Amino acid sequence: MARTTPIARYRNIGISAHIDAGKTTTTERILFYTGVNHKIGEVHDGAATMDWMEQEQERGITITSAATTAFWSGMAKQYEPHRINIIDTPGHVDFTIEVERSMRVLDGAVMVYCAVGGVQPQSETVWRQANKYKVPRIAFVNKMDRMGANFLKVVNQIKTRLGANPVPLQLAIGAEEHFTGVVDLVKMKAINWNDADQGVTFEYEDIPADMVELANEWHQNLIESAAEASEELMEKYLGGEELTEEEIKGALRQRVLNNEIILVTCGSAFKNKGVQAMLDAVIDYLPSPVDVPAINGILDDGKDTPAERHASDDEPFSALAFKIATDPFVGNLTFFRVYSGVVNSGDTVLNSVKAARERFGRIVQMHANKREEIKEVRAGDIAAAIGLKDVTTGDTLCDPDAPIILERMEFPEPVISIAVEPKTKADQEKMGLALGRLAKEDPSFRVWTDEESNQTIIAGMGELHLDIIVDRMKREFNVEANVGKPQVAYRETIRQKVTDVEGKHAKQSGGRGQYGHVVIDMYPLEPGSNPKGYEFINDIKGGVIPGEYIPAVDKGIQEQLKAGPLAGYPVVDMGIRLHFGSYHDVDSSELAFKLAASIAFKEGFKKAKPVLLEPIMKVEVETPEENTGDVIGDLSRRRGMLKGQESEVTGVKIHAEVPLSEMFGYATQLRSLTKGRASYTMEFLKYDEAPSNVAQAVIEARGK
């Protein structure tokens, strides 16, 4: 099969927003105008197409980023058909992992803001993630029909709160119930959408007389921004020459692709105004797969040689699995983004991260949760594969004859855990199966069995994250569970280097004995300096311990790291240097050296000033001014460190760093302090040493 859409006419975009900015309605309208979806789904009555899990429809928040394909030829049919692949991203802080995951595979993004609420704390988190992956973006200021809507105020917040350089492409004509359309600042015309056909058709009209002066001022601002793209254009502009529409658009596109400016559009998705022009801006200004740098990877040659893949059908096949979803009809769906080459259903590919081969059984393209089966996918495509056996989020799929590992995704460690048990014994096996599937879908969610209590423990990024997991078990797998009290994921580490710690395991009473003897140094590592949080250096000279036993020493220590001597929590940021020891020709074995290493580890750990680390959360509270004192007082009682506050239109925004252990039940307390008028967001920031009284209480509670 030949390629149907040239790759330069692809746009792989994400639509990202704070909860309640109207992102779901915006996506729905995109599907409507691109002709995929003929009845507009409203999130107000739970019928939206993109939000395909029951839960999302009930809570009105988007949890899983579904990928949808749509085609657009422009409001005035001015382009050849462009293929837009939309990755829907969640807006709640407990799901930032989903956002991060989708940012990896996007080429561009549309940031949706509410014209009333403006830039919210969650918008800042998403913004940082987009910066991290250098994603070019444009903004859409939605809900211009709401009370208190103010387009230019939001433009200013994009500048002050996000540190970006916003350039309006449009101005709103009227606001609140008087919002009727937009001024196109490139064409210098008003756009008036036809209410009778839900905004499918439109007219260009003259700019309203009372807006001409303002429009000229912002048109000038737009032209200046365009002129800064090159010296040539700047000279032309300064020489008093008019820039053509092509020159303006080309220059603005260049600056968006370089992440120098954010073009801002506006509208009301609910009132069918503005989404159409925003789609034109996606085509005009956001990158195709060939406009972004080639993806980097490493060759599977044992030397980690850097390599790259360009967005071309002629290069070897390479793709990144960015999401695993469980589908009620077909089982596992693996969403993947193709960076290079072509793959057909029935082909065998290599999962280079796991060094395993996988066969592409069926390939489907998703439209929200409806699917269309396709035979092949090419560079730039986003699709889902059915029937892959052992693929996890972040794995690379590639041509077995040209193996490459694309940049790995990094996922944060969970910070909160709870014990779960099925309400009936009969559900035990079903629960294990359900949790296993959910953990495969979501790398920021973990599940394990506590060896001492034999309880099943689930861990995630926040209380809401775990609530939703428990809820999904009930809905999708029909397993009802009782949930324990949330537990904090503490860590242990050392603060001091200790040298020449000896560990000896010797049993030589008749018959074959056991003998292993090691001497190690232990030392603290800079937090975050080693992604594993542990390093092992083999410094054995002259074969005092034979090479075949060295991995056993490393393994013996790694097993001890899982449950530290202090309170049984994982040990992090620690290095081991093995530099001496002895062995016995007959009695030495791997097991003996493993045991010797664990004896040395326990001995050394006690002497190395062990400390307990606790997760610290970055907390932002928005509260009415009159409650500021109460909120700050309450955060201080929770051992919070105040990091600053600023005045907002809606009240005061307080920034603090608070230990997670003190944040349980905070939502309820904040509601009662402020009569429900305050809101807060919380995300993991870092691990820090717990004060001795807190550490003591934790250690005693663990019975150590």
Curated annotation (Swiss-Prot):
Belongs to the TRAFAC class translation factor GTPase superfamily. Classic translation factor GTPase family. EF-G/EF-2 subfamily. Keywords: Acetylation, Cytoplasm, Elongation factor, GTP-binding, Nucleotide-binding, Protein biosynthesis. GO terms for cellular component: cytoplasm. InterPro entries: EFG_II, EFG_III, EFG_III/V, EFG_IV, EFG_V, EFG_V-like, EFTu-like_2, G_TR_CS. GTP binds at residues 17-24, 88-92, 142-145. Its main location: cytoplasm. The modification N6-acetyllysine is found at K504, K643. It is found in: Cytoplasm. This is Elongation factor G. Gene3D superfamilies: 3.30.230.10, 3.30.70.240, Elongation Factor G (Translational Gtpase), domain 3, P-loop containing nucleotide triphosphate hydrolases, Translation factors. Catalyzes the GTP-dependent ribosomal translocation step during translation elongation. During this step, the ribosome changes from the pre-translocational (PRE) to the post-translocational (POST) state as the newly formed A-site-bound peptidyl-tRNA and P-site-bound deacylated tRNA move to the P and E sites, respectively. Catalyzes the coordinated movement of the two tRNA molecules, the mRNA and conformational changes in the ribosome. NCBIfam families: EF-G, PRK12740.1-5, small_GTP. One of its GO terms (biological process) is ribosome disassembly. It comes from the Bacteria. HAMAP family: EF_G_EF_2_B. Residues 8-290 form the tr-type G domain. Pfam families: EFG_C, EFG_III, EFG_IV, GTP_EFTU, GTP_EFTU_D2. Disulfide bonds: none annotated. CDD domains: EF-G, EFG_III, EFG_mtEFG1_IV, EFG_mtEFG_C, EFG_mtEFG_II. GO terms for molecular function: GTP binding; GTPase activity; guanosine tetraphosphate binding; translation elongation factor activity.
